[in-house]
Amino acid sequence: MRNKQAQWAVLKRLLSYLKPYSLLTFLALAFLLATTVIKSVIPLVASHFIDQFLNNLNQLAVTVLLAYYGLYILQTIVQYVGNLLFARVSYSIVRDIRRDAFANMEKLGMSYFDKTPAGSIVSRLTNDTETISDMFSGILSSFISAVFIFVTTLYTMLVLDYRLTALVLLFLPLIFLLVNLYRKKSIKVIEKTRSLLSDINSKLAENIEGIRIIQAFNQEKRLQEEFDEINQEHLVYANRSVALDSLFLRPAMSLLKLLGYAVLMAYFGYRGLYLGITAGTMYAFIQYINRLFDPLIEVTQNFSTLQTSMVSAGRVFALIDESNYEPVQENGQFKIQEGNIRFEHVSFSYDGEHQILDDISFTVNKGETIAFVGHTGSGKSSIINVLMRFYEFQSGRVLLDGVDIREYSQEELRKNIGLVLQDPFLYHGTIKSNIAMYQDISDDQVKAAAEFVDADSFIQDLPLGYDAPVSERGSSFSTGQRQLLAFARTVASQPKILILDEATANIDSETEALVQNSLAKMRQGRTTIAIAHRLSTIQDANCIYVLDKGRIIESGTHEELLALGGTYYKMYSLQAGALS
């Protein structure tokens, strides 16, 4: 954003969003031009009154005065309508930009979200787009208005007296020099200020998400200090921006305007009578200097907001242009019929350097359950990420019903895989909408899904039943209740493949019995892959795979692995000892 070419590219792209609103923009510009013309005529009427009627008041003088005030009223009305039209165009464009940014964000792969703080993304979709709105609603209209006013005022001044106009024009190079100097000085400061604001949002989001852990480990003071450090740095750069505005904007421009008055008055006093310059003409010129300088002062003041808008637009367009998408699917016509899964020598790395999965091979068919166990970082969840196509694997093959997983459309793949996570996510809405997940299913189907996983009993105990409100992340429900709702959501979607990513890890022993009963029913007739921390929950699996550093080091049934006396045996013994 620091070179002119990049800034022009951003501006050109911003202006391209005007295309769908060409008619509305044309009307706004027409009202803006009408306002400018009226503003240019008003000093002429005043000049005529001073020269012709100041010492000779009559009926015509009253008519001229009424015309003078009538023009002011008309200017106010026309300007108001023009501002409304510009505001409508502005908010429509911001809606479109925000929609494009959100649409692209939804298509991005998990790797983008792994490396990009949530607060930074939120900042781009909220703060930065609002700044763009300021540009279209205020800055763009003021820039165009300044051009209209400059041209019409300059023409009128030349018609009135070319000599006085020449004197005024001597100040224009100084004005443009001042504006250019401000632009160069401010861009770096503004970029840094916006970046720090994004950091503040990221830090806030992180602290709000982890407030329980922060308080549990007495980390309030440390995180307060970290936040204060970023906040203080933002204050420093914000003050620098204000200092630049205070120096280069209104004070300097106002000084030039006053200097213009002085030169004009001196010239009028020295040569005015000799050259036949009337008092009315002089009054008109003073008004025109105001009309010439005031828009330029406003434009210069808006340069700060313009620079901020350009930086913000660059950040939003970076999100719109982000191409770190989910792995590519062929959008083929294949349909998942059974849900049989086969991994053939699959290797995977998140960063292309450190191998997370190394030569993984296994098979699981409809009606079977397999489980993956291992220490943290062994690669269990990475297998799920590969199967869900959240990430692209580097080598090997993944087959579904004998067809390469890449040959299925993303929609076909996702609708046939039911994913239940360790920490179930509930959306703001109702219990019904969370189970249905906005699919076109009936209330009876929602209730049947809840009954199937034994969630109906606690739902019916709620005052509003299935219409009971769900707060953000479902914080008003217990962990077990949230998990049962997640199970009901999965059953309602009727997937052929079920993935359980430590689905019972956070549930107490009493609730676990209820959940295990629900899981047993869910697994019937489905291909099931379970990632387990509690080994007691996967003892009935058809095959258990033990992972270590991305490789399968043991496999077999629960009894076979215990008899082997290897890693699984040690893990099971440790858990059994802890329980006893």
Per-region residue spans from a language model:
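Membrane-integrated ABC transporters
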Residues: 1-39, 46, 54-67, 82-86, ...
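Juxtamembrane loop-to-helix connectors within ABC transporter transmembrane domains
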Residues: 10, 18, 86, 94, ...
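Alpha-helical segments in transporter systems
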Residues: 12, 23-44, 48, 64, ...
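An intracellular "coupling" helix at the cytosolic face of ABC transporter transmembrane type-1 domains
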Residues: 20, 110-111, 127-136, 140, ...
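Helix-loop-helix
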Residues: 57, 64, 156-170, 244-314, ...
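ABC-type nucleotide-binding domain
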Residues: 262, 328-329, 334-580
